[in-house]
């Protein structure tokens, strides 16, 4: 896909829930969405406590507004640790189930080429990553809602159960440069190896699965 990096001279919208979310038309995002049981509550609370202490010590009221130096430290200290918690394999890990993973993949690919362009993506046992470029005037939040809502319906139906499947708030990061894009591509492609997985994952690019193990 044609990559357009974040442009600081172009209007940017930042909204915040528990995490900051940057939005700018025409850019690419690194998205991580996790299952509701993927991080135990006590570990999630500890992560948030340490993050809030760091923000207070750095006199930062909003992590969406950081200097470049502080942003790099923030991602080292908290973004990386957040992903380490996911890779620890907590929870039921239903996406290691071939049928459940396939239903999520179908939802990821449903809008590819129309509502958005998918670059590299990876289905892990309790979360997934994707590099995605929304089409013009298609909000990223709407894309993620379709992914989560559709796959939740399909997977719950397959497993014959009800209830929340996904954690409410996803993690997304606006890609700022070609170098960062390549970094995220490598991270996604290597995530199964980093997590020590030999089965139960799928790595793809666009509409094609590049590496499938255990499915």
What are these regions (language model features)?
Residues 1-215:
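Short catalytic/metal-binding and nucleic-acid-binding patches
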């Amino acid at each position: 896909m044609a990559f357009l990096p974040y442009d600081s001279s172009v209007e940017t919208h930042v909204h915040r829930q528990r995490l900051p979310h940057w939005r700018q038309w025409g850019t690419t995002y690194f998205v991580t969405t996790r299952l509701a049981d993927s991080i135990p509550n006590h570990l999630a609370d500890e992560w948030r406590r340490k993050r809030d202490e760091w923000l207070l010590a750095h006199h930062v009221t909003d992590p969406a507004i950081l200097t470049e130096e502080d942003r790099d430290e923030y991602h080292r200290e908290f973004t990386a640790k957040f992903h380490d918690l996911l890779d620890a394999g907590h929870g039921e890990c239903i996406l290691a189930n071939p049928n459940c993973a396939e239903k999520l993949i179908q939802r990821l690919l449903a809008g590819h080429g129309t509502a958005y362009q998918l670059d590299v993506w990876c289905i892990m046992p309790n979360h997934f990553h994707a590099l995605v470029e929304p089409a013009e005037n298609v909000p990223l939040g709407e894309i993620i809602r379709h992914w989560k809502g559709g796959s939740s319906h399909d997977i719950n139906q397959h497993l014959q159960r009800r209830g929340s499947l996904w954690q409410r708030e996803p993690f997304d990061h606006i890609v700022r440069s070609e170098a960062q894009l390549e970094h995220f591509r490598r991270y996604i492609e290597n995530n199964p190896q980093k997590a020590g997985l030999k089965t139960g994952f799928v790595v793809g690019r666009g509409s094609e699965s590049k590496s499938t193990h255990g499915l």
